[in-house]
């Protein structure tokens, strides 16, 4: 079993199920197209992937997160000696099992791509070129993004599902603010890496979506429609499966209060 995340059980159970064979179903249409949600942390990628799963656009998930990848690779027979992941073999075995309507989707983050490509930009671009479509997910307010990332690390709670209670930050600003500063630097570095690589991919294959747009239903639907029109081979689009849960939107009051205190301190220091 995967370790329970935060104070709730629903998120942990969801990860457990997505790593298990429960979602492994060879698609009658085989595999004809691939896409990736390429994002820095805390940009709403989990939420977007939930929505795209509802829409039958593959089973997008964070397959290359080491904690999940090792578990999936072990049952697919893709672990080498010493527990090393054979990426190519794992992808080849996973894609036919997780395609839906002929489409495979995955979530991908900069550190995962760095690891998969052995820090080679040329290899990273070659990996990105395997995808027919690439969604760049970004966030305009990087300070709130860094605060969200710090909070997730402190609480070990990345999304909220069902009635899982939200856990607040319980450390002093003397501990929290250096974490936020470090995360701001990491986010800037990852953004630069992501956008520079994406600029080397065919621009017709790339679409950018901002976190701040995700609250608008038409933004999610626009991405789903774009993917289906490009990858659905002209077939009628399937009806969404609303039984599959979406993450709850977290109340940002705590994060905005932290932001105000952080900016006040920065202003005082300058």
Q: What is each of the regions a protein language model found here?
A:
Residues 1-99, 243-250:
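PAPS-dependent sulfotransferase catalytic core
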Residues 6, 80-87, 120, 139, ...:
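Intrinsic-disorder-associated interaction segments
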Residues 9-17, 107, 111-116:
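Short coil-to-helix leader/linker segments, especially the first N-terminal amphipathic alpha-helix
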Residues 35, 58, 104-106, 133-137, ...:
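Hydrophobic/aromatic beta-strand patches that form the interior of the parallel beta-sheet core
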Residues 109-196, 204, 214, 221-234:
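PAPS-dependent sulfotransferase catalytic domain
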